[in-house]
Amino acid sequence: MAGLIKKQILKHLSRFTKNLSPDKINLSTLKGEGQLTNLELDEEVLQNMLDLPTWLAINKVFCNKAAIRIPWTKLKTHPISLSLDKVIMEMSTCEEPRSCNGPSPLVTASGQSEYGFAEKVVEGISLSVNSIIIRIRAKAFNASFELSQLRIYSVNPSWQHGDLRFTRIQDPQRGEVLTFKEINWQMIRIEADAIQSCDHEIMSAPVRLITNQSKIRITLKRRLKDCNVVASKLIFMLDDLLWVLTDSQLKAMVQYAKSLSEAIEKSTEQRKSMASETTQSPTPPVSSQQVKNPQTSTTPEQNNAILKLFRDFDVKETSYHLVISHLDLHICDDIHSKEKAFVRRVTGGAMQLSFSQLTVDYYPYHREGDGCSHWMHYGDATKTRCSWAQELLHEFNSNIEMLRQAVKDHNPSSPIRTVPNASQQYGQTGFDQNVKRSSPTAFGEPPKSNPLSSSFVVRLADFNIFQVSTADQCRSSPKTMISCNKKSLYLPQEMSAIHIEFTEYYFPDGKNFPIPSPNLYVQLNALQFTLDEKSVLWLNQFVLDLRQSLDQFVAMYKLSDNSKSDEHVDIRVDGLMLKFIIPSQKKQDCHPDQPAGISIQTSEMIGSNTRQTANCRRSDLEAIFQDFKDYDFYSKNFTSFPRSHDHFDILHPIFQRHAFEQDTKMHDIYKGLVAPTLDTNALSTSAARDIWAIHFTQFWVDYEGIKSGKGRPVVFIDSFPFSIWICQPRRFLQSQKRTLCDGDPLQSISKSESTDFVGRLQRKKLLKQYYSTELGGSNTPLQKSQSLDSSLANPPTCKQTDADIHVLAHVQKHVSLQINHYQYIFLLLLQESIKQILENVKKDVEEVTGKPDDENKISVGLLLKSADVSLLLLPLPEDNSKSPLPCEGSPVTDHKLPSPSEGVTGDLIINNNVDLINKAIFESDLKGDPQKIVATDPLLSKSSSDTELLKRSPPYLDSTADKDLLEAELAFGQQIDRNNLKEDPGANIDISSSFLIHPLNNHINSNGPDHALAEDQFASPLLPEVEKKQLVDTSGIPKERCLPNLSVSYKNMKRSPSQFSLDNISIDSNLLDEQMIESDGSDHLEVGMEDFSSLNYPCTAETSSVELRNEEYCVSSPDAISAETSQDSRQDLMSVLVLKVVGINCGIDIKGEDATICLQINRVVPNQLGNVSVWQYLNSRNTGSDQKSTTDERKSSPEISLRLEIGPSARRHSPLAAENGFLQCNVSNFSSEFLTSTLANIHHFVEEDSVPEIMPMKIQVQNARIHLQDDSPRNNNTDPDPEPVVLNIENLFVERRDDGSFWIRGSPDTSLNSPWNHKETSSILQLDCSKSHSTNSKSKTSKFTQTISEHTSLPEIPDVINNQAWKAAGISKEQLVEENECLKQELAKTKMALAESHMERDRLLHQLKRVHIEK
């Protein structure tokens, strides 16, 4: 009996072992136990059984002792146990892939029989190994793996031990069975060390990794008829890992991986070409004759339960998975290494990388038609990637159709060789799994296989990369450098922090047919990056050293660098709630308004080199390109200041080619540059031809760490959409040149045939574009350049105007930013810190590599149509009762309430009853002529007496009733908002009337929530343009403090001309939309305006501040609550200067160390808002407005042109410019109005705490007019108002030299390469001292001074005298000088008379308004 059993054992084990004899088997038949000693396993059989990759081969396997135990009576429920004591395996890597693996001996053991009892018993064997030692010898290193307590056993679908009958799920209808196995071990020890030889002496540290208990879960799906494995799923699960690597160990790992990369790549290609399609095709249901009927019959309910269970655990395709619950990786310097050839800037550094729930999935044989819903961890990210990939495949199918037709046209005389339709080959929405095999290929052969794809999916649930820590720093927990903010943003926990999918396409039988390009999808969610100087410098040196050692290793072992860096890959990167923090590196005395850093954030970001995503399509590039072309600044022919002749071409033709799809492979085929073929690389392109598009849905910048912000970020730049387009012209042209140099693709065709072929293709493409345009119904504003196609026919050459990288940055909407003095100082320090980091990085590159960094050339074009720059300045003095600016009120709500003892500041409170009464008074005027609604001129001034205030009230109001209302308001402690609306100086329109009638027409008082009142900003014939209506923001008031009725407060005081312009008072854009919809035709209050350029002399005007309250609109906020007390309000007050900037054109040229910034601003409109509550202003401004009122008109010439040169090339201007830069600025045709206090505050704003660096500069001002109003406090209230000053500057040149001195001249500097225009020959500084509100202004004289510029000085007269015509006339020099003086006097008198006429006109208009009110 024992002999028969030994023969059977030898029969089966001889397939796995070598030199096995009966004397090596000790068998106990009755106990079912046996032992084998000194077993030598068959290497090839073991390779086939383990299905090892072909780049790895087994040389020898030895086992000292094996024991087996067979439960004879329980074979159905209990497994056969096989125990091995010690297994030693020797392996080696193959430089060339070995032959593919054969069938597994487990399959052939039953003689290709059906899945029966014997197969179930063999498959249920459990294996345990005490110790396994695997030694691997590679080309450059030796490695060893030691595993202890390895166990392999069968489990149920819940991965638990149990009856063998429950470890498999069998589906007779499909003819398939699922089995589940688990492999675990106690410990694994991995060690790798470099091979030392006399030929290759390399300093390398051994790499060691020790892991704790881990396991592998395997699910197999077999066919019942032949036991072949149809699909399998393997999950490698690792528990917490802690790995400490020095830089030398990490370099060794990279070198070892590099040495294996070539062999692994060849093996992968071999595996793809030999992949069996039958293993991936769905198995048809087998007949009842193919499967043995089970011994016991089952009920339909049981069958349904089994089918459901099979579907739940079905393995639809082969996949491999790696799951690491937590990984802590520590990278540190190797302080004992002696191979360092450079001095480290940061020594003894260490960095910790912490990863949670890291998963890596690999699907080697995926069919696109099967979908991805069965993938592990399938979620929204995979859905997004699938929809994007479907669009890519749809475009590829279209190109295949056109390529098929091109091949047919290319070979019209050849026999009928049709090619398969793209829909048949790849499917309508992907790779079609039901390919019609009846379709012949290009050579009359049926397609052998369907295309497959291999996908890698990497997911990272959460991670933290900490800043570098050194031994000399204090002991504290390290701060994060890169982290995920899912918890703080309340994002779903199942959302991955990083999601990456990489997909390649191939034919399993290696068919030579076009395949789509690989695609890479990356999703980044809630990531936060913190710029740390020490970490950046340490990482820079660490990576440079790693790269340098890898290059030396490749050269030493003569490894081929066959990386596919030039191969095009379709890439898309999605970002959600990304944040980049730049902290201040220089610590200074911390002021409450001093930021600790700035944060750059975006709500959603999309970056792609494909045109299948929103805001990244060719039509978007076409629209942006057209916006840039609307400005001459971006033209390559624009060489005047601030641009120059050697500047880069910002609008490179590559962008235009790409917008019109003239840079594709199909376009080259249409042009006859490439012959049409149906091979694998027929539609492949180079990565050098990629055009990148990056779109930010919302992009904003905040200040971080401001103490006065109470832990909240403070807005720096409000959110706005932002688009960036990037191309690489030099790489593009080099790639195109290589394509053209490969030879004439049409050399086998005669010239006439080639011409006919290209002509046919072009006509077909034009017809297709024509009909697609007609169907689309869209006309492209940007016409195709006729030179685009012609330029492609010529060999491409690199021009001096071509940079390595061209960038177009386009801001679609209005931008608003605000900054105060301390934030400005912080930005200067931040700029110095970043500059220092860049310099250190550059020095480290030269130190490590031993050569200077490559000189990159970058061109950046930025287009911003409009922006508001708010300067938060020191508050204006409040003790001046006659100040032109309001002392307490502001265009934004100011909730400071004066006490009864302090009196009232000129505010009169009127409730709804008064509004209703007054409606009848002014209704007739409104019906008659809306423009005749004018106000009285009460000439109100600040007073502390309520009686005086009521005496100066308008005559149509009841003083007693108003006084009662005022006292009631003060008694309730109601806070009063003061929204100072700017009024026209020439036409004093009654704002109160418009507010009494307009709300009633819109039914504001009766119609519920969010109906804030809108005021039409009144127009005047004396203002330069008609400005759009704006609404008054009443947010920020605590709701519980809002009165239910509508309150209107009046405040009249003297205003400067700068306040006469119509300001854009901001509110929520939603309220603006609602109010404009509800408007009932009150737009008639806007009238046409005349040019304001002639009004140089101010007149007294009274303005009204109207506050509209709606209880349902009032919102409680911490800022309003904090401003309840007057003391807090005074500390919170700041004066605000808003610079409305229109038409910002910027070009940046970077050439190595040199950088040139050219800026051109079309128009700047200052707007002085006066004292404003800072937090109230920040909360109530309108961040979403497009500010169309400031962008309707563009000047023909820019007001400000600026050029800043940085780098060694600036030395041509001055020696100091090479270090600190050189600034050139031209201000022309600038007209504005300023208060003297505002100018003083601006000086304090830009004043630095430390001694600033001297920057040489040249500034020229031409045809500028500045209106100055002195609003300084008066010593005595009876003193007359200060006299306004008008500065007219025709030509002024200011130069700052290296010693810091300023030189001021009246002549332009010819070194500025700009055509300075001069309208007159003299520069005049005119001072107007007349009082604008005087009734007898004709008798007043005006003081003026006149300065003569150098280019009209007397030394030029001899040149005129030398003229023969003047000599013939007998005119002497003295006569000319005398005539010149007379002309000067006449000119001065004329200007004086013109000014007096303007003032007389203003006086008459003012008196006319009084007459209307008295009537």
From Swiss-Prot:
It is found in: Cytoplasm, Cytosol; Early endosome. Keywords: Coiled coil, Cytoplasm, Endosome. It comes from the Eukaryota. Residues 1367-1404 form a coiled coil. The keyword Cytoplasm applies. The keyword Cytoplasm applies. The lineage of its organism: Eukaryota, Metazoa, Chordata, Craniata, Vertebrata. Residues 275-300 have a biased composition (Polar residues). It holds the Pfam family BLTP3A_B. It comes from Xenopus laevis (African clawed frog). GO terms for molecular function: lipid transfer activity. GO terms for biological process: early endosome to Golgi transport; intermembrane lipid transfer. Residues 267-300, 882-904 are annotated as: Disordered. Tube-forming lipid transport protein which mediates the transfer of lipids between membranes at organelle contact sites. Required for retrograde traffic of vesicle clusters in the early endocytic pathway to the Golgi complex. This is Bridge-like lipid transfer protein family member 3B. Residues 3-94 form the Chorein N-terminal domain.
